[in-house]
Amino acid sequence: MATPLFHADLTVHTQSHDYPIVITENAIAENSSMASQVAPYITGRQVLIVTNETVAPLYLKALQEELEAQFTVQVCVLPDGEQYKNQSSINQIYDVLMAVHFNRDVTLIALGGGVIGDMTGFAAASFMRGVNFIQIPTTLLSQVDSSVGGKTGINHPQGKNMIGAFWQPQMVLADMSTLKTLPARELSAGLAEVIKYALIMDAEFLTWLEHNLPAMMALDLAVLGEAVKRCCQYKADVVAQDERESGVRALLNFGHTFGHVIETHEGYGSWLHGEAVAAGMVQAAELSQKIGWLTSDEVACVKRILSLANLPITPPPIEVQTALDLMGHDKKVKHGQIRLILLKSLGEAVLTNDFDPHLLTDVLATHAP
């Protein structure tokens, strides 16, 4: 008896509009019903698919041919990598839109991972002051996190995601089958964001992950699908409460302030985003222990589960002052003070600046050259 394909439907509620998250299998395969799932969310007759040089050979043809039966379809294929998440790539998207005289009736489709999703969303938010877009995330990281919630943007040489907009998609279609073509390193990077949700919101989920990580890393799509569904539901609930990150949504950035320091310092693309977040979560846990919130056993638990996912648990050597300067560019800085997401306990996070700055310096010094 054949194993039934995984399928789940969720809804994200936002001030601008509600939209579905469809988590499924084999949606982008040739002769699939993908177009029937996406087409209802395409307004107008114009479609621009934005993808990259890695994803295009795998999935572009099937998607493009299906949509061409109903729409005028153009394609923009960008280089692959975090180092290309910049204004030059955004201009390439604009150039295609302008060259074919697409207008406000266009729908952009992001076919790729977090970088493609962030850039396509930002292009959609800014082209003609805003057009629709759809997310088709093809990496675990983008399926569980970046494709949901409307954060879009690009990097600046002095800081990650410094330029962007909140712009919600019309739908998110997460095809679990795309994870079969994901390199092991990219899968692990996505697991960092999955583990993040457990650490900040749900200690029971952390226990579930410890038990199920081997199956996830062996590409058991049913188990991966359950993890993606849980993470998307967590994020949808948070976005419904705080769409523009003025409060509780900031907790989703656990590990990211430290992680962005790593990415910016080492050069975009040197460390994958999930790898940097993993090391950053350990640093945040270490600071939480110094404050007196976590025990040494709990910090060891954080390190253990990240190691199980083949993720780094120590950052590269960075001078303390350099790290502090980079943290000063963080979007959570308020009135000149660095605010961090820390753990009160496993499964409970808080955004705070109520800590001795010397404790932060101590954590950074542990890994300084």
Swiss-Prot record:
GO biological process: amino acid biosynthetic process; aromatic amino acid family biosynthetic process; chorismate biosynthetic process
Note accompanying the cofactor annotation: Binds 1 divalent metal cation per subunit. Can use either Co(2+) or Zn(2+).
Top-level EC class as recorded in UniProt: lyase
GO CC annotations on file: cytoplasm
Known pathway: Metabolic intermediate biosynthesis; chorismate biosynthesis; chorismate from D-erythrose 4-phosphate and phosphoenolpyruvate: step 2/7
Gene3D superfamilies from the UniProt entry: 3.40.50.1970, Dehydroquinate synthase-like - alpha domain
A GO MF label: nucleotide binding
Listed EC numbers: 4.2.3.4
Chain residues that bind NAD(+): 80-85, 114-118, 138-139, 151, 160, 178-181
Keyword line: Amino-acid biosynthesis, Aromatic amino acid biosynthesis, Cobalt, Cytoplasm, Lyase, Metal-binding, NAD, Nucleotide-binding, Zinc
Reaction equations catalysed: 7-phospho-2-dehydro-3-deoxy-D-arabino-heptonate = 3-dehydroquinate + phosphate
Subcellular location as annotated: Cytoplasm
Pfam families reported for this sequence: DHQ_synthase (PF01761), DHQS_C (PF24621)
UniProt cofactor(s): Co(2+); Zn(2+); NAD(+)
Recorded superkingdom: Bacteria
InterPro entries, alphabetized: Dehydroquinate_synthase, DHQ_synth_AroB, DHQ_synth_fam, DHQS/DOIS_N, DHQS_C
UniProt-annotated binding residues for Zn(2+): E193, H256, H273
Function of the protein: Catalyzes the conversion of 3-deoxy-D-arabino-heptulosonate 7-phosphate (DAHP) to dehydroquinate (DHQ).
PANTHER family associated with the record: 3-DEHYDROQUINATE SYNTHASE, 3-DEHYDROQUINATE SYNTHASE, CHLOROPLASTIC
Family designation: Belongs to the sugar phosphate cyclases superfamily. Dehydroquinate synthase family.
Protein's recorded name: 3-dehydroquinate synthase
Organism of origin: Psychrobacter cryohalolentis (strain ATCC BAA-1226 / DSM 17306 / VKM B-2378 / K5)
